[in-house]
Amino acid sequence: MTRVYNFSAGPAVLPEEVLQQAKDELRDWHGSGMSVMEMSHRGKEFIAIAEKAEADLRELLGIPADYKVLFLQGGASAQFAMVPMNLLRGKKSADYVNTGEWSKKAIKEAKKFAGVNVAATAEATNFSTVPPQQEWKLDPGAAYVHYTPNETIGGVEFSFVPETGGVPLVVDMSSTILSRPTDVSKFGVIYAGAQKNIGPAGLTIVIVREELMGQALPGTPSMFDYKVHADAASMYNTPPTYAWYVAGLVFEWLKNKGGLKSMAEINQRKSAKLYAFIDSSGGFYKNPVEKHSRSWMNVPFTLKDAALDEPFLKGAKGAGLIQLKGHRSVGGMRASIYNAMPESGIDALIAYMRDFMSKNG
């Protein structure tokens, strides 16, 4: 069977090397006679897997010692609630920046727990750009500032880390984590669903500064309290062990690729190549995002005539290029090109797009 190029926004493509290692170890992990899926999460075998995964993630991101790394469940959607439940700490409001669909979801959930000050929004530009920070209206008394550095649906990405004047900065890094170097010390909380750049669905990584834990809202369920999970080394309940294991393999793969600086160079090159082709197509293909706000990870584009969408997708599938249909809320196409998408996948996509244009232009 020939592998396809999978441009899914998530669950997304995994590195070939990781899939092969997982296959090789599936029935017998390191001579244990067990699959990782069968291991007790409190047994020494899985503890070794868990500890190495955390150590490798800390090394890749340069996570300071005063931050806890939590391996949780529930995706970013659960974090939309966990963030205000844990970080309000006696305050009544928080600042949010609205740059698209995932920002909106976070804002909607936060309103159940606190007053939300939308400090900036990209609605006026139909979410085609990131509002410059000089236009933001931050509240110095806010409990925290929340933003989404990359909107996977709209393909809008921040090119800067916001300055918050000492107010804790919270970031939904689900689609950009590990795609480039990150100064973790600038953030109070980083959270990320795993199914884009980390591993399989079912795992959520949360990186939280220790001083921000331990003041959850009264009545917060134990499963939603960061400190409960930190004190239990992410094993307050049975964690998603296999997803944690595969994430660890991805961390090893990233280290072997040269780390996040090397990954950033590859990702920038991949996205630049695809945008350059779209921009040179004479309007046959269009990307709606302002150039300075274009995403490295998610490239949405439309064809000159929506009637060509279905033939385009059918032909792409025949060429081994799948999951290119845009999100239902915006239509068109979307190529998600996370870390594990090889550059050859971009080349194959461009070749197909060029051929389709020549036949339908």
Where are the model-predicted features located?
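A glycine-/small-polar-enriched, mobile loop at the entrance of the PLP active site in fold-type I
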Residues: 3-54
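Active-site phosphate-binding strand-loop segment of PLP-dependent enzymes
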Residues: 10, 110, 121-177
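Active-site C-terminal subdomain of aminotransferase-like
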Residues: 15, 194-275, 290, 359-361
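Conserved active-site segment immediately N-terminal to the catalytic lysine
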Residues: 170, 184-195
